A protein has these predicted regions:
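The conserved cystathionine-beta-synthase
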Residues: 7-25, 32, 71-89, 96, ...
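Short hydrophobic/aromatic-rich motifs at helix boundaries and adjacent loops
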Residues: 16-19, 32-34, 52-55, 64
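A glycine-centered beta-loop-beta connector
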Residues: 21-24, 29-44, 85, 93-109
Length: 125
């Protein structure tokens, strides 16, 4: 899990988010207000705005963010977490504790955890 989380607010413009994604090399960010996850925004969302001819500097994230965000509780075990990633076809999951954002876990984080926790098996030659 990564913390602190780089996030954005619902009133941020699409342009500001694009700049933040570019500077952090992230592909998406949680949209947060008072430490509560309100939505999530990704590069794909920004690209769709461009295709629609929207003005990135005046379009707030609240108009195009994904609102139905799947989150994980900070005490979630690895198998339910893996299932949430697969079932929901997401690249990242905000991690919460008592409804407040405390971190974020990505597919990369999950793969690293699996690699680090898998014992090496002897090679049969």
């Amino acid at each position: 899990m990564t913390r602190p989380v780089v996030c954005t607010s619902p009133d941020s413009s699409a342009y500001d988010i694009l700049a933040k994604l570019n500077s952090t090399h992230f592909s998406g960010l949680p949209v947060v207000e008072d430490h509560v996850v309100m939505g999530i925004v990704s590069e794909k969302d920004i690209l769709q705005l461009v295709l629609q001819g929207k003005n990135l500097k005046t379009t707030p994230v609240s108009e195009f963010m994904t609102r139905d965000v799947v989150t994980a509780d900070q005490d979630c075990a690895i198998l339910p977490l893996l299932k949430a990633f697969i079932d929901n076809q997401v690249l990242r999951l905000p991690v919460t504790h008592q409804g407040k954002l405390v971190g974020i876990v990505t597919r990369h984080d999950l793969l690293k955890l699996i690699i680090d926790s898998t014992p090496e098996f002897p090679v049969i030659s």
